[in-house]
Amino acid sequence: MPETGVRNGAFGADKFGLKNLEAVYWNFGAPQLYEHALRKGEAMVNADGALCADTGVFTGRSPKDKFTVRDATTDQSVWWAGNQSITPEQFAALYADFLDHAEGMTLFAQDLYGGADPNFRIPTRVFTELAWHSLFIRTLLRRPDTSELAGFVPELTVIDLPSFRADPERHGVRSENVVAIDFVRKIILIGGSHYAGEMKKSIFTTLNYYLPDNGVLPMHCSANVGPEGDSTIFFGLSGTGKTTLSADPKRTLIGDDEHGWSKEGIFNFEGGCYAKCIKLSQEAEPEIYAASKRFGAVLENVVHDESTRVPDFDDGSKTENTRSAYPLEFIPNASLTGRAGQPKNLVMLAADAFGVLPPIARLTPAQAMYHFLSGYTAKVAGTERGLGNEPQPEFSTCFGSPFLPRDPSVYGNMLRELIARHNVDCWLVNTGWTGGKYGTGRRMPIKVTRALLGAALDGSLREVQFRTDRYFGFAVPTSVPGIEPHILDPIKTWADKAEFDKTACALVGMFQNNFTRFEGDVDAEVRAAAPEVRAAAE
């Protein structure tokens, strides 16, 4: 079995049962992987030099096809209300069939780290069938120095074979597409899908399982750090502005999606970014635009002009979930260490399409835990198929429900403790609607959001007066220099005050109904942080 590239010769593919392979290419960089991807017809190079691939049927993750091994260890440690199980025997059969399927293949292997902090990173080996998948995961995770590769011993192994087809009856899964994770053996098997994001999020799920035992809170968030070393964490679901608001030219970007919070500070899990690029423009997001238009970037499902190979980022005919993967070093003000000290501020972003949340509110640690466990935003027509004219609430616990292997209260309690220990200021920011709900109101002006966020991060919001919100109980500033006072109080932006009250009460009820599943896992202080309609202030 020919093996080419820098590697640990004593810990090769045979250690994982991979045998009779055509070849294994180890730790190849972008130029070599481009060559193989083009030679194999997996991808094409566009006019900017980016490697471009289509993912076929699967243009996003398939959460219903993700399974976790339920054994004596994970029976008690995994949150089974949010995760699907298979037996150890079913996983063993799946693993054996993966190994059989791989015989005769050429595989690409990457030795990488999940995590920028040497104290907590997890050495990860990824075998892929596709060369462009190898470049993708090399871009997204942390790359070791070449000198480390000869002695690299993985703790976590991923085998990614898009041409594999699972047998639902034999393997205990739903379809021919599968993502299976064995936390005890530390193996991830991915088959049936060409969507590269399955690798990224499966590894993230695994880090979310292991790291709490080491005192690290894993988070689905972006993060940046100011010139004084003051770092900020941004939580938020898709469409809330997490990537946009954390990309601040005055601050250094730590990462755009996955981080850990330890006693030493915060650190990026990744070494690259995986940005949505539908309607990407130089004017709106110049750094992401530039990073996506150069050699080394990997574009998924982006439509191109057939003759010129120029990308059309406005064309969503293949999918609205077009993606660009690129190394962090493609962003001019990104941190190459991926690490920062203890956060000074924590921001939870919500695109409230009901138009009743204030543009900014200060949270107590208990309120922060409540809103973290709630993970609220709202969907509107145009963001997802099948939505009508009315906004639809979305609650994704810990702002990352699909990636949580442990009970959400594990992460919520860790967050609350870290906030209290490090005296972190917590903020809820509404990037959604004002002056009415979606359809009658308008989107919160980005200039207002940036100004309020700037005032929170530089400490000037500490100097203003606050009121207690009648519906949600958090503290809302009554005046902020440079901001018109009425926009700080949502009811004052609505023409119909009675309709505002009706809508606000309805949203309070949605929060309360969603949180019933967590009430047995939190203490009285967190339960008391729940929204309720309070008497109006005099």
From Swiss-Prot:
Q: Which residues bind ATP?
A: K201, H220, G236, L237, S238, G239, T240, G241, K242, T243, T244, E285, R323, T449
Gene responsible for this protein: pckA
The cofactor binding remark recorded in the entry reads: Binds 1 Mn(2+) ion per subunit.
What does this protein do, in the record's words? Involved in the gluconeogenesis. Catalyzes the conversion of oxaloacetate (OAA) to phosphoenolpyruvate (PEP) through direct phosphoryl transfer between the nucleoside triphosphate and OAA.
**EC class (word):** lyase
Q: What is this protein called?
A: Phosphoenolpyruvate carboxykinase (ATP)
What HAMAP family does the annotation carry? PEPCK_ATP
Which cellular component terms (GO) are annotated to the entry? cytosol
